[in-house]
Curated annotation (Swiss-Prot):
Species whose genome carries this gene: Chlorobium chlorochromatii (strain CaD3)
Active site: C341, H445
Lineage of source species: Bacteria, Pseudomonadati, Chlorobiota, Chlorobiia, Chlorobiales
PANTHER family in UniProt: COBYRIC ACID SYNTHASE, DETHIOBIOTIN SYNTHETASE
This protein's record includes keyword ATP-binding: no
UniProt cross-references to HAMAP family, sorted A to Z: CobQ (MF_00028)
Gene: cobQ
Metabolic or biological pathway: Cofactor biosynthesis; adenosylcobalamin biosynthesis
Pfam families: CbiA, GATase_3
Gene Ontology biological process terms, A to Z: cobalamin biosynthetic process
Name of the protein this chain belongs to: Cobyric acid synthase
All copies of domain GATase cobBQ-type, residue ranges: 260-453
Amino acid sequence: MVTPTKTYRSLAILGTASDVGKSIVATALCRIFRNAGIDVAPYKAQNMSNNSGVTPDGLEIGRAQIAQAEAACVVPTADMNPVLLKPNTDIGAQVVLQGRVCSNESAQGYFRDTSRWAEAARESLLRLKQKHELLVIEGAGSCAEMNLYPRDFVNFRTAREADAAVILVADIDRGGVFAQVVGTLAVIPPEDRALVKGVIINRFRGDSELFREGITMLEEMSGVPVLGVIPYFRHFAIDAEDAVPLSAKVDPAQEPETGKVGVAAIYFPHISNFTDLSPLEHDPSVTLHYLHHPKPLSAYKVLILPGSKNVRGDYAWLQQMGWEKEIRAFREAGGLVIGICGGYQMLGCSIADPYGVEGESGTTQTLGLLETETLLEQEKYLANSEGVLVGTSIKAFGYEIHNGRTTVGANCHPLMNIVARNNHPESDVDGVVSADGRVIGTYFHGIFNEPAVKQWFLQQADSTYTLQPHERGRQESYELLADHFRQHLDVNKLFELIDYEQSLLP
């Protein structure tokens, strides 16, 4: 382990509510501090999300912390997100502890005694502090849920253990920003209130000059300085943490725009890794719609069945909703059907769960659009993988997170040849393509991140599709995000909070 040559005071980014933008603020700050030459790392004690990824050493953490590590230019580790809760029912979740599946817990069971989870989180926090000069800590939900406060080890307890300066993030777009900030500060204990050193107002729309008086009023009412008002900005593609913002985009009334490739994605109750579709959502030549309720799909050229944290349960929902009829009609009309991970399993003939991995044991007969059968095994498979699309020289990069082992019949051929897993040479195959090429399944999450791979898939549906002359990469997106925040933050105050020598400011 390399000992940091300099240490700075940690920053904790806590929120007045869920989905106020804590993850994006933490990501921006990671890149801002990295650009100042600081060895910075992200940390979130507990994350509730079905958007997860795989670290280089084969462990599972939230996608948001992987994105933050990328922004900080450090290798993601399980210590950056020691407790990951992956909801698999309305009242329960799989617990991933320091990168490994630990147990399935009901909400009541999990919160009955959080000491085990809190101790693991504390161990990871201390290890990260020993390895890096600065930690940017992200809280969870509202930091002022007073009924949960004694058991909340993610927000102020973490801030106290890290001796962190707290920045409170509020979302002005949802309204009530004064009540958000002042109300939060009013209900938390005085010793925690004393840790709050600044407020960031996120997602401002319009002319920020019109809010200048509001800043003065908020500072007078709260006694805490406003570090910045961040305008609403959509021009970067960075992985989201959960499906809260996604729910606002489901079942749009309008059809896909003329001249664009229309892509429909089924919005399962337990959808997971919907970040797989981010490259499509941010492609100006694509219209992506998430659909919860079935409807005729003739206006679309591609239908995607994304990942699911409860595959058999979500397939039962799909049947009950009447989706089978629309999927089959779309396939028979020549549409391109793509399944990713759980969606891939649903495209096959059956999914067997003899061990009750996702709930009640049993076997579910599925769509039968691919000649495959899937067995859910007790051990979860995790890997960062690299492949080459069959019949091309196009390289694909992705990560695998699945309990399913899928066997393939004779009338299908592989989607890609696997050449490496976890940086070790590999000779294997992934995925399935139907005989006519209109149904494709893969276990690769992040399959569309590589522009050439995205182009290959979309050209199977629309031969006229071409990539934009300049597609922004992830690192460029982090720079764009950091620049946006620097323009609207009091950077001097920000660096002052971490005890950074002002003469060294970039």
